[in-house]
Amino acid sequence: MQARYSVSSPNSLGVVPYLSGEQSYYRAAAAAAAAGGGYTGMAAPMSMYSHPAHEQYQAGMARAYGPYTPQPQPKDMVKPPYSYIALITMAIQNAPDKKITLNGIYQFIMERFPFYRDNKQGWQNSIRHNLSLNECFVKVPRDDKKPGKGSYWTLDPDSYNMFENGSFLRRRRRFKKKDVSKDATKEDKERLLKEHNGSQSAAAQQQRQQQNQAQAEQDGSSQPVRIQDIKTENGTSSPPQSMSPALSAVPKIESPDSSSSMSSGSPHSIPSNRSMSLEAAESHHPHQQQHHHHSQGFSVDNIMTSLRGSPQGSGELPSPLISSSRTGIAPSLSLTYSPSQGSIYSPPCSQGSSSGGGAGTYHCNMQAMSLYSGDRSGHLTPANTPAATTVEETLPDYSITTTTSALSHGNQEHPHQGRLPSWYLNQTGDLGHLAGASYPGQQQNFHSVREMFESQRLGLNSSPVNGNSSCQMSFPPSQSLYRTSGAFVYDCSKF
């Protein structure tokens, strides 16, 4: 800006030079402003002008834009941030005896805070008012040992916690003696009430203990004899038995005739088959009795072991049971058992319980039992004896008696064989080796057994009594009705 406007003389700008005695004052002010930290960057270009008028403007601009520094007030003249109650409390607590006169309060405040050295009339009047109006300050009469003017002032003992955390800047609440008395009476009442309640609770507890002792003594005098206290001659406790040992050791055994006749609705049920030679079973197999006593259900293994282990027991079997076991009515038993009873049978042969079709599946132990019992009953009772006719009379719904006996004795002839398919007539001789063979519970010819059951099913379907028969068996769809080419050997341990 100065380069554009070259000033040759002050008259070209129309500025009249003002020369007076104040010119030296402005120069001094400008120098003071420059030395005092003003806008020195602006003063340097202005110094190009050598005319005193420019120096005058320069000093005015520098003083106008300079920092404003008012006259600082001394620290002693600042009013302290304490209330009059706080000032009086400071003076009392600073005294050696925790009590001080009114003149001593004045002297303490003026020595500590110089602000109160002036205008003594105003603040001293406020001090007197606060001493008389606040109940936290207590006036103590003067004794004769210390002569002087005025009484002592001290703090109330309950007012020491007026200020929070000992800071005189913050006061909790206005101290009132009535509140202190109310609090004291309230605390006394609560303390008395607690003591009264404690005495009452102690008395009630003592009375309850006495009642418990009296009741215990009464119970001890009239306590009945318990069953556990009754000792036998050996010193062991004997609980009462609801039934005799002979009855408790007898397992529940149902014959195939009774279950099949009940399921088919036939009135010809044989209740004598439920006994099933208990004397022979008790004398030869006590551990099996214990097992069946715990299971309380029908077990095919019991019949199997009774037929194998005790020939004299099998000789005592009634003829209807022998004939029915020979005729292979075991498939009808599967109609009366739910799948939840699959745990009765042995674990390796769990085909019947795992397939889910409880009404149409067969257990391998049952099949082996039926074949084995058929073989045993074959040489015990001939096929044409009255026992076979008894089964025919007892079970009118079954027309397959001589068909199965023809399977067991492969040389007999019967009119029902004419109704069977031609492929089955060629396979009747294959079952001849089953009579003398032993059947373990885990491996057998499963296809031969299945063909025997299929022949019974075909015989049932072709019999004239099949219209009203309730013993129809549903086979699982996984088993085909016709024999495929090749002999399949089923291992029950796989299932």
UniProtKB/Swiss-Prot annotation:
This is Forkhead box protein C1-B. Residues 233-245, 297-313 have a biased composition (Polar residues). Residues 178-197 have a biased composition (Basic and acidic residues). Residues 79-173 bind DNA. Monomer. The keyword Nucleus applies. Its main location: nucleus. GO terms for cellular component: nucleus. It is found in: Nucleus. Residues 175-326 are annotated as: Disordered. The gene is foxc1-b. Pfam families: Forkhead. Keywords: Developmental protein, DNA-binding, Nucleus, Transcription, Transcription regulation. It comes from the Eukaryota. One of its GO terms (biological process) is regulation of transcription by RNA polymerase II. Residues 286-295 have a biased composition (Basic residues). InterPro entries: Fork_head_dom, FOX_domain-containing, FOXC1/C2-like_FH, TF_fork_head_CS_1, TF_fork_head_CS_2, WH-like_DNA-bd_sf, WH_DNA-bd_sf. GO terms for molecular function: DNA binding; DNA-binding transcription factor activity; DNA-binding transcription factor activity, RNA polymerase II-specific; RNA polymerase II cis-regulatory region sequence-specific DNA binding; transcription cis-regulatory region binding. DNA-binding transcriptional factor that plays a role in a broad range of cellular and developmental processes such as eye, bones, cardiovascular, kidney and skin development. Acts either as a transcriptional activator or repressor. Binds to the consensus binding site 5'-[G/C][A/T]AAA[T/C]AA[A/C]-3' in promoter of target genes. Upon DNA-binding, promotes DNA bending. Required for cell viability and resistance to oxidative stress in the eye. Promotes cell growth inhibition by stopping the cell cycle in the G1 phase through TGFB1-mediated signals.
